[in-house]
């Protein structure tokens, strides 16, 4: 029995002695971090710093496989190369895979022209990883997003309306600014001592968050007129909320 097999046997005995709930945790990263020859380690490092890792959304949730064992042949059984059209992380299947958790954005994306292109086999059709980090999930910066959009809506004129790339950047800059204001407001509300005032402010915070959610969904439909309208409503509500927090208005 080689050293890896012995280590696997010891780990298996340890897992057998742990509660059933703990055994359900994803073990992919544990094994991959222990190997010096794992391909594409940056992929693993990105995941480890991501909200996915913090919420125990392991590799198997997207790639498949068995995340409860340490024997590579068993753990990797059923995992397909992303180039395989049956793979859940193939670019055409990625929206449905991500949509298993991110339902709202997936439903909105299905209403877009981009989704039609993607499902029709158009290689220019964007998928989730076009705009989001494929592992960490964060949206690209507004400038990086503009660059992505300009590959089609730009000088090459693969698609019409070259101004859309610039408009997308500007709108996502606004979205990020409002999101930062909401984050600040939430932190300030939590420090309010009076329970009734804190509850009233939190209700106002939630009302300001509604158009933000709708703006994000409009972004996933790529309907930028709708996105802009929701951002204006969100901005108005956030400004009013911040004034109330500062006690400048009733």
Predicted regions, residues:
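Positively charged n-region of N-terminal signal peptides that target proteins for export
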Residues: 1-4
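Bacterial N-terminal signal peptides
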Residues: 7-17
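Short sequence/structural segments immediately N-terminal
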Residues: 20-250
């Amino acid at each position: 029995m080689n050293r890896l097999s012995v280590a696997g046997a010891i780990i298996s005995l340890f897992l057998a002695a742990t509660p059933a709930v703990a055994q359900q945790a994803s073990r992919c990263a544990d094994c991959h971090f222990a190997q010096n020859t794992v391909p594409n380690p940056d992929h693993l490092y990105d995941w480890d710093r991501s909200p996915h890792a913090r919420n125990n959304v392991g590799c198997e949730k997207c790639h498949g496989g068995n995340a409860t064992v340490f024997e590579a042949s068993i753990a990797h059984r059923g995992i397909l190369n992303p180039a395989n059209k049956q793979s859940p992380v193939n670019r055409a299947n990625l929206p449905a895979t991500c949509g298993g958790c991110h339902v709202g954005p997936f439903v909105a994306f299905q209403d877009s022209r981009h989704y039609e292109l993607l499902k029709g086999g158009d290689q220019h059709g964007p998928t989730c990883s076009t705009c989001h980090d494929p592992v960490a999930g964060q949206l690209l910066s507004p400038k990086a997003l503009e660059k992505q959009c300009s590959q089609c809506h730009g000088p090459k004129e693969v698609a019409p309306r070259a101004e859309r790339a610039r408009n997308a950047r500007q709108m996502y800059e606004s979205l990020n600014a409002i999101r930062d204001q909401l984050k600040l407001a939430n932190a300030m509300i939590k420090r309010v001592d009076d329970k009734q005032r804190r509850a009233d402010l939190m209700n106002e915070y939630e009302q300001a968050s509604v158009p933000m959610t709708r703006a994000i969904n409009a972004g996933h439909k790529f309907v930028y007129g709708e996105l802009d309208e929701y951002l204006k409503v969100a901005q108005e509500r956030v400004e009013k909320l911040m004034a109330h927090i500062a006690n400048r208005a009733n």
